[in-house]
Each structure stands twice: as structure tokens, then as C-alpha cells.
């Protein structure tokens, strides 16, 4: 399988395993009437979503828009789509022909695509408060990374599984909704919504005013984290807060990026991701001088 095919049809085994584990071990699901359960507090009908064609940066894409009508802040939303049962052989052949003409895929790999059921997905890790909306979320072929641009291809699929992550009492819960069985299942494990370092380094950088912080490397040399739910304006305000702490030595910057040292040699690195409304950040200690 060549690299193009891998990017095109990569399947998410982790998601499949998570659905299996949560559905089998938790034993907490709803019936088709939507009866409430202990851990599932999300009703999929409260997330109003739509997929259609749209123009993004001058190009036509198939995109997902949705509104959070739940009572909770959402941190992740993903929908996978599966091939409709009534797709004809002619429609499947036309789909494969379109793919073959659009991408550099060998005949051997095309045979593998022809043998697969059509699937697609759309996902975003935007942090969305109740009543807020998200637009222009790209849809992708299969579980890969190639953008979906033909609405006729989307018309060959139907919703399969929705994955929703939401905040409740400073924890992030994960819920799955199966459109086929009309049942919910919940992950037994939760995540801390705001993960902040307890090392001395954490006192050398402002705590972002957001609801979700995901920590990465965290030791005496460096503290790395991602903060979610920031606008570019909020990111620029955060830069100014870092400057007020003295991070103005040998600065490097452009829109969406800032890095500088303070007088003691500590460094901050800040990068803004406009697509996910998030900030990649780190604060690092001075490098030890070699003897």
C-alpha cells in the first residue's frame, strides 16, 4: 500500500476499540426512546448539525456546521459516515472512477478501495459553549486526511457513529451515539479538563483563561501544553501578559507566533492554531552551561 492510499483510507482502530470497550464494559446505554442513563448526559438531538457544500478560502469543500444546544461545553465532536445500503454498483463504480482520476493511486491500491465500503468522517476539537456554533469543518474520505470536495460522494453515505466530548464538573466525558441502533455508550474514564503543571516552571508563565488545557511534557526543564478555546485576539492578549512577566529578550514574532526569553534565560514559545482555536505553548528553563 503506497503512502497516498494510506493517507486516503487510514482507519482509526483506536476509535473502534474505544467504542467496543465503552459499549461492552460500562453497560450504560439508552434505549431508542432516549431514556437517560447515569453517565450519558448528552442528547445527540441537541447538537444541530448539517453537511453541505461551502466555499472556504476560495475553494469548494464539503463541510460540517453545527450548533451546541446542550447544557454543556463541548470539547470534541466527530461523526463517521458509512455507505448507504442502497448504493448501486453504478454509483460505487463512478465513485471509484472519480477517486482514481483525482488522486495518484495505483491500480493495485484502487482494487483495495473498490473492495471497501465507502466511509467518511468529520471532526473538530473546537471548545464550544452552549448556544455557540461552529462552521466550515472539513469532511474527509474514510478515516484519512484527503478533503471531501464532491457533494455527490457525500450523498452515498449516512451517519454511523457520533463521538462527543463535554465538560461536567471540571472533567471531560466521552459519549458515543450509534445512529444504527439509536443507542448511547460512555467511556468509563474521564480526563481532567484543565491540566496545569505543579512544577516551579508553571509559575513563570500565565495560566490561560480557558476551560481546557492539555499538558504535554512536564518536568523541571520544560512545561508544554495546549490551551483550547482561544480567539486570535485572546492569543495576542496572552502574549502581552507574557511580556509583562519579562519575556521580551531577543523576541521573535509574526501573526500567530511569539517566542522570547526573560532576563534569567527562561523562554516562552507560543503558537496559535486558527483552525482549532488553540494555542501550543511552552516555558523552558535556561540551558545548563557545559563545563
What residues fall within each predicted segment?
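C-terminal motif of bacterial Sec signal peptides marking the signal peptidase cleavage site
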Residues: 19-23
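Bacterial signal peptide processing site
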Residues: 25-28
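Compositionally biased P/S/T/G-rich terminal and signal peptide-adjacent segments
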Residues: 34-49, 184-223, 284-291
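Short aromatic-acidic-glycine turn motif
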Residues: 55-57, 83-106
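Asparagine-centered strand-capping/turn motif at beta-strand->loop junctions
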Residues: 65-73, 86-87
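Short, hydrophobic/aromatic beta-strand segments
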Residues: 72-80, 90-97, 236-239
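Short, solvent-exposed, Trp/other aromatic-anchored flexible loops in extracytoplasmic proteins
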Residues: 102-171
Amino acid at each position: 500500500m503506497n503512502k497516498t492510499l494510506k493517507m486516503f483510507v487510514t482507519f482509526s482502530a483506536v476509535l473502534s476499540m474505544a467504542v467496543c470497550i465503552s459499549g461492552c464494559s460500562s453497560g450504560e446505554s439508552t434505549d431508542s426512546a432516549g431514556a437517560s442513563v447515569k453517565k450519558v448526559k448528552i442528547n445527540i438531538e441537541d447538537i444541530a448539525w448539517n453537511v453541505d457544500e461551502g466555499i472556504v478560502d476560495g475553494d469548494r469543500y464539503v463541510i460540517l456546521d453545527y450548533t451546541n444546544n446542550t447544557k454543556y461545553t463541548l470539547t470534541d465532536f466527530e461523526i463517521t459516515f458509512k455507505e448507504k445500503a442502497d448504493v448501486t454498483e453504478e454509483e460505487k463504480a463512478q465513485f471509484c472512477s472519480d477517486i482514481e482520476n483525482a488522486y495518484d493511486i495505483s491500480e493495485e491500491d484502487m482494487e483495495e478501495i473498490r473492495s471497501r465500503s465507502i466511509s467518511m468522517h468529520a471532526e473538530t476539537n473546537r471548545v464550544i459553549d452552549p448556544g455557540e456554533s461552529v462552521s466550515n469543518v472539513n469532511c474527509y474520505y474514510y478515516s484519512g486526511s484527503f478533503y471531501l470536495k464532491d457533494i455527490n460522494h457525500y450523498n452515498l453515505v449516512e451517519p454511523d457513529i457520533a463521538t462527543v466530548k463535554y465538560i461536567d464538573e471540571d472533567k471531560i466525558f466521552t459519549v458515543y451515539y450509534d445512529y444504527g441502533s439509536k443507542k448511547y455508550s460512555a467511556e468509563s474514564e474521564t480526563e481532567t479538563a484543565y491540566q496545569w503543571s505543579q512544577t516551579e516552571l508553571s509559575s513563570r508563565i500565565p495560566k490561560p483563561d480557558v476551560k481546557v488545557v492539555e499538558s504535554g511534557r512536564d518536568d523541571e526543564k520544560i512545561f508544554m501544553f495546549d490551551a483550547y478555546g482561544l480567539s486570535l485576539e485572546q492569543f495576542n492578549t496572552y502574549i502581552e501578559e507574557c511580556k509583562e512577566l519579562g519575556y521580551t529578550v531577543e523576541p521573535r514574532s509574526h501573526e500567530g507566533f511569539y517566542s522570547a526569553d526573560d532576563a534569567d534565560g527562561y523562554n516562552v514559545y507560543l503558537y496559535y492554531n486558527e483552525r482549532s482555536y488553540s494555542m501550543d505553548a511552552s516555558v523552558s528553563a535556561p540551558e545548563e552551561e557545559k563545563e
